[in-house]
């Protein structure tokens, strides 16, 4: 089985910043990877296109995926509002790791984060399901618009997204 690759075209206050592509580990976490893939294509009628990264903490991570409330309190999965933690096989080993944000055990929706550092304290709590393939420089550029409390100085959006 070939793992899917998806892309985000990132914009800052509406101006193009660049493309980030992700390898999704469907061989290890098929349900979680499929959720992210389908939300990236928008094939279920909803998804990431036009949504923002509402929380960016330099030296930690960039969080997005709340396409319903745009502030970190919303989002939904392709399986319903929430779905269970699939497994914790993959670890938060360093920059570029793609992992599910949650509000405790078995509360995965659509929110995710891209690590910009090793975050081993999240192992066993958040499901890792992908990795930046290309465009880590774009993720690093996004980081510059973040702050210690996560508030962004400019609006960082997913202007377009899909599967490669």
Swiss-Prot record:
The modification Phosphoserine is found at residue 77. Its EC number is 5.2.1.8. Keywords: Acetylation, Apoptosis, Cytoplasm, Glycoprotein, Isomerase, Isopeptide bond, Nucleus, Phosphoprotein, Rotamase, Secreted, Ubl conjugation. Disulfide bonds: none annotated. There is a cross-link at residues 28, 82 (Glycyl lysine isopeptide (Lys-Gly) (interchain with G-Cter in SUMO2)). The modification N-acetylmethionine is found at residue 1. SUPFAM superfamilies: Cyclophilin-like. One of its GO terms (molecular function) is heparan sulfate binding. This is Peptidyl-prolyl cis-trans isomerase A.
């Amino acid at each position: 089985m070939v793992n899917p690759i998806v892309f985000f075209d990132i914009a800052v206050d509406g101006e193009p910043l660049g493309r980030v592509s992700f390898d999704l580990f469907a061989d290890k976490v098929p349900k979680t990877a499929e959720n992210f893939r389908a939300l990236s294509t928008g094939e279920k009628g909803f998804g990431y296109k036009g949504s923002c990264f509402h929380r960016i903490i330099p030296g930690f991570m960039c969080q997005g995926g709340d396409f319903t409330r745009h502030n970190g309190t919303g989002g939904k999965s392709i399986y319903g509002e929430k779905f269970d933690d699939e497994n914790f096989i993959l670890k938060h080993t360093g920059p570029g790791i793609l992992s599910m944000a949650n509000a405790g055990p078995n509360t995965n929706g659509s929110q995710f984060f891209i690590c910009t550092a090793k975050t081993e304290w999240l192992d066993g709590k958040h499901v890792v399901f992908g990795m930046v393939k290309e465009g880590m420089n774009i993720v690093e550029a996004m980081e510059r618009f973040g702050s210690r409390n996560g508030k962004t100085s400019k609006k960082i959006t997913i202007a377009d997204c899909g599967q490669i």
